[in-house]
Amino acid sequence: MTSEDKTALCAENILNDIYILTINRNIDIDIIQEGLLRKVMDEEESNSILFLEDSSFSKNDISILNVHLKIEDGKNKYNNYYEFKYADINVTIDFYQKECKYSIEKSNMHKCHYFKMMNKINYITEQKMDFKDSILYLYNTINDKNFFKCPCWLNDNKNIKLNNIINDHQQKKKKKNLYDKSVQVTNDVTNIMVNEIQEQKMKKPIFFDNKNDLNNSDDEFNSAHSSLIKINKLLNVEENDIFHNLKGHVYEEYFDKHEDNKNQKDNIESNIIVKDKKDRANNIISEQMKEDYIKNVEEVLSKHINNNKNNNVEDSVSLYSLDEEISEQIDKQHFFSIDKRQDEISNFIQMEENINDHMNDNINKMGKKKHGKENRVVEDEKYIQDDKKKKRFYRNVNDNIPLTVQLANKGNEICKEIIEMNSRYYRDFFEEKILGCGGFGYVMKVKNKKFNITYALKIIRLSNSKYNTQTNNKHINEKDNNSYIMEEAIMIAKLQHENIVRYYDAWVEENVDFFLYKELQNEFKNIKIKIKNEKMKNEKMKNEKIISGKIKNENIKSENIKSENIKSENIKSENIKSEKVKNLYIEEIKYFWNHYKKNKDPNVNDKYLYILMEYCPGKTLREAIDCGFICRNEKLIWELIKQILKGISYIHDMKIMHRDIKPSNIFLQITDNILIAKIGDFGLTTRIGDTQINPSAGTIHYISPEQLNGEPFNEKADIFSLGVVFFEMFHEPFSTSMERSITLSNLLKGIYPEYMKADNKKFQFLSSLLAINPQERCCAYNLLHESVLFTFEKDFTDIYNLIDNKRNCEEVHTIISTLFDKFEYLNSDKILKKEDFSTFQNAKIFTDDLEMRKKQKIIKKKILISLKKRGAIFILTPIILLNKYYINLENTYMEEYNIYYNINKKKENKINNIYINTNKNKNIDNLIYMLDIYGNSITLRNSFFLSFAEYIYESIDSYNKYNEDNLFYKFYTYGYTYKNQIIKSNKHIKKDTINNNINTTINITTTTCNTTTGTSTNNNNNNNNNNMGNNNIGNNMGNNVSNIISNNNINNHMISNNPFYFYNIYPDENEKMFYCILSSSKNVFGNEELNYLSIFSNADIMVSIYTLYNHINYFNKLLFVWSYIDLLEIILKECLDIPNDISYHLSIDLKKNSTLLVNKSFVMSLLQKYKIKDMSKISDHILSLFYIKCESNKVDDYLNNIYNFVDDLLNKKSSLQLKRNTSITPKEVPYVRSRSNNISTSASKIIKYDIQKNVGTKEKGNQNDNEKKKMQIYSILDRIKKINNFICTNTVINNTCFDLFLNYEESIFCNEVIFYVICESKNKEIIAYGGRFDEIIRNMANEVKYKNHANYKYVYNNIKDIYNNNNNNNNNDNNIMNIKAYGVEIYLDKIYSKVIESNEKISIHLQYNPSTDKSQLFKNFVTSCQQNDFACTSHIIQQPLLNDDYLNYSSTKILIQVYEISNLLIAYDLSKKLLTKNISSYTHLSINNVNIKKKIKNFKPHKIQFFITIKSNNTDNSFDALKPINFDNVVYKIVNYDDQDCNFMDQAELINYLIKYF
């Protein structure tokens, strides 16, 4: 590398410089924005947040670094508040401009240090120093001890001049405030003491007769005045002021005659001067010094009492002497020193004045460089205004400190007791610093004394609650306002969200001075009573000790008696000391209260609201915007907007409006290296819908237009404020406040800058936020969940909500640990043996491989990118489809395949399946159907053509609202489709076995399409080739239908009677992508767009892949879909000609009153409210229908009676009786005997109908209608019978499972195939398959197109009628007829297999043949979180597989065992109710009644905690479809995993028991 390359500004050089610099342990460098890493790392491996569209900085030319520089040990250590400890330098590296920009974090730095550092940074910028040299230069600068000496703090050795200035300022202030008070106090005390002494002289005139006594009296008088002098010293009044007020030569002579007293006076003066020089924060005096001094004073006092004759005068003088001596020693250091916070504020004010010129000079220099002279003046004025505002605020806070708190900090025990009893704030929290202020109060950073936790505490002064008769209404309003504020505070305290500043608690306190004022009014009676009680208690204890001592020790020595007397004297002296100290505290409070009251109003009636909040140590969004960093990082802006929207959506869901959304109220906090935005400062919050709010409240430039106009508003006002914030985040920092005001004011008028309009994505989002009309603004939820910008996170949000709602679930803990625990992938070199695959011959064997997963993901991603570049929109299509569009309910049959049947032998791996299936043809109308738990007919998604057709049909109006001719849309999706897999047997079967198998196949069919055309077996073989022909739009529809039906019959016969075929247990899963083009009939772009090369030209899909997934754990997973079907509504509608809307409600009323339908009159009463014609006849029919009962174990007989009832009823309706061409002959065929010994020979019987129709016979309309209605009801009855037989066959044996699934062939779209086969050499495999499918959409417009057709002619005529009457429909079929729908399915699994073929590095030693790639496991069709699983098998716990894996029962904790079919609905009802309580269950139907306690052991590995069995109380276990279910006529037996069991008769008690457990 050349020298130029080493100094060039590139990512590699910057990383090398970072590595070299961080070797120094005092330099830490963090990469904040990953643009630097993107320069040296592959783009695919980046873990950054990706958005749908990249911004203009998508090349990541900008990188942000944070450089943390520390001071070396031993340097710049002055142990002072303003000590410089470290510096945070923000470095912005622009690789495109080839420059570095430096800024410094000033929040933790003194102003003097900040200005000096800015000068150094300006020097670096001017000299254009490189990155490494710049950081080293700054590091050496901060370690220069002389350079960073701050002139703002005091040093004992230096800066004497500044020290004297501050001391003079403080002394003058004290003299001014206390001079007048001291004069008044001095005169008052002097007069009192002189009067007392004169009164004593009047009583004792003998003292004037004796000169010595007179001198003694003068000494007492002088002693009193010396006490007065000391008292004034305690008041911080200088001695000269005292002597000017106390006139008389007596005091001068006193100090001249008595040298000791004069020395004492000098010592007091010197002590006061020294006290002013020392630190006034030192407020602690040793308790031992207090006690020693008080003892000495007591000794002097006792001697003085013994020597003098007049006890009264002596006590009075001694008392004053004692008081002033004790008070002087106790409070010499701190009684009248300035409070610590007051001292800091005064020092801060003085320092601001001293360095004001220095700061202005720096601002002027910076202003000249950036904005010129005009901008410099504006910034100068702004700084001065902010500075004055800050000073004013600190003075106000200092003035509002309660007197009780000030005295308590100085050591006043009475004030401490008042705070302890009445103030939670001052009792539980330390004040650290002020964080900010506002119109409602200020915020203080506090720390809990007990738990040492830091909080932010907002203090709001409430309105004065004092009653005033003249302003009665005003104070009532203030009271209401206070209650309103309290309600809002409590409401806000309930909010808890990741993106909202947490509000922990709120409470109201009286001003603590209010309680001090009450004590003053009561003259401290409570305190005095407390002192008196303590004195009495001590005396009582002393007397008890003396009495007990006399009883026990009658012969006590004199020395012991003396010791007892000494103890009693000590107790007495302690009482005296305590009482005197309390009196001094009281005098102190009285004096300061008078001083406090004269200077300002104490406002003792004020109340304060305290709101305890989460402390966010980071910055606000306002600071991030002003520094100019955030506007360059578009991805960060979108991420922050998303988080803010989440917070706003949450508070709106809680029916709360913020009303003050602005950047300064949004806090940025870094937690675990993740930037989180939190909404705070809910000062203007109110409930949504509150009409008693001030519309104009808020911050200018951020309030909505409706607020400015004084109109009613709702939560959409917060959305407008967010729009202004969003605009500021993208806008560069404003140079002046005037520019900011003009730009933001234009937003209210709908005027936006041109650069914002240029970006369509940003402008559309901003327009949705700043719409002038509130109704046109989007709500927070829609912006977050329905906006294109955030829709890619829907799945993540659903998963997060699921995990968040079920935090205590064991599976959720497993998911979290799996996702976030560190683990290593171990590559195993084991070779799979060929015999290991024998058990899984019907399933693909996959192995785990991390590299393969990555490459498959890359393949899928590249195909998706190709589709996105073509403008396709991603749409989710359902797995389960509605069969009302596709199924033919008549073309159903049931068949059972028993291969290798031998009644005397039981062999493993035998296949015994029962299918409820449709004809195995290629007609799109004859697909497999299933019944869900609600009785709806459904099918699995067998192709994306059908799922997209259903989606388009249901939602076409939203895409083509105005029936436009230029309709053109492109969609794509990916997922799995399912079809039945037919496997060909390789072994020949004996003829007898074949015949037996054919005889056991039972078909229930109503289709006899006997059209014969020139078709043969070759038709089936050549079907794919015919399907891949060119577009054949003009083909004759009748011929197509004829060919389809003919081929269907041949295929049915071939497959159902060919022993070489059998069905696989599970449907085949195919992972696919689907690309769809929807265009109008006049638009010709569809054919051009749907081209293979245009789709795959940009996708390099042939990538090396050598292994596939492992899904062995899902082997033999069971799914059972079951339902009960009610015929009553259909019979009322089809047989009795009752309208649809009436038949539905009437059927409900009849079922509710089924037990009361005993006579015709009651039925007539039910029919009267529906106004039905022929009410008498209909009542007779309904009554006869309800007379048909279902007896025990005779469900088939009951269904036969229903058959006869419908047949007779429809025959009677027919006005013209013709000779029936259709003969229906019921034949009872015994059900096939199964291999299990548990099967009863009296099993259910299936009714077989052979229906033959003559196609050439012409029937009249009314007879044809009756036949169609009859066939429809018959088909539903067949379904009910087959479901009943399916559940009650009693053929549940080993290795047998019952699944309802579908049959699907690849070549159903045979008319217009556009996509062909991707060929390599001679191997042809369908990878992409497509065609037109708008005909399917048209067919959906008429649900009865293929329903109930009696013959081929009916089908043909029906098709013609549909095509002829399309233009007459009034529904969305008008839109459907104007579109063309093209689509292509891409088989991802086959693409993977092609890649495997082309890859020579196959890691597994198994020959892989793509043609044998048949079936996959039923792995991706799983029930949703709001649906339970049902199974039907005798062995729920399967035998362990080769890898010792068991079935995975997901999150199921409860298994419900059912033995009778009649209790299956009860089990379903129980599971549904448990699911509403977030308790999932697995329902199992089995006749194998084994000991439960033995079974429960098998469930321990599956984490199933409860095993519930449901048994009937009575012996009648018949299934009566019309009889209401009695949920309490069963016994619920529950066993836990510890083999503890109990029984419940009531379902509610059982559910409560389980809820308590979970």
Curated annotation (Swiss-Prot):
Q: Which gene encodes it?
A: eIK1
Q: Which organism is it from?
A: Plasmodium falciparum (isolate 3D7)
Similarity field: Belongs to the protein kinase superfamily. Ser/Thr protein kinase family. GCN2 subfamily.
**Secretion signal span:** none
- Report the protein name in the record: Eukaryotic translation initiation factor 2-alpha kinase 1
Quote one Gene Ontology molecular function term. catalytic activity
Binding positions for ATP per the UniProt entry: 435-443, 458
Cite the InterPro entries for this sequence.
CC_SR_Kinase (IPR050339), Kinase-like_dom_sf (IPR011009), Prot_kinase_dom (IPR000719), Protein_kinase_ATP_BS (IPR017441), Ser/Thr_kinase_AS (IPR008271)
Kindly name one Pfam family recorded for this protein. Answer: Pkinase
Q: Protein kinase domain: which residues?
A: 429-789
Q: What is the effect of changing residue 458 to M?
A: Loss of catalytic activity
Catalysis: reaction(s): L-seryl-[protein] + ATP = O-phospho-L-seryl-[protein] + ADP + H(+); L-threonyl-[protein] + ATP = O-phospho-L-threonyl-[protein] + ADP + H(+)
- Could you say what a knockout of this gene produces? No defect in erythrocyte asexual growth and gametocytogenesis. No defect in the production of sporozoites in the mosquito vector. In blood stage parasites, phosphorylation of eIF2alpha in response to amino-acid starvation is impaired. During the asexual blood stage, increased in parasitemia induced by host melatonin is impaired.
Say what the protein does: In blood stage parasites, phosphorylates translation factor eIF2alpha in response to amino acid starvation. During the asexual blood stage, involved in the response to the host hormone melatonin which is used by the parasite to modulate its cell cycle.
Location of the region described as Disordered in the Swiss-Prot/TrEMBL record: 1014-1033
Q: Which GO terms describe its cellular component?
A: cytoplasm; nucleus
Report keywords, A-Z.
ATP-binding, Kinase, Nucleotide-binding, Phosphoprotein, Protein synthesis inhibitor, Serine/threonine-protein kinase, Transferase
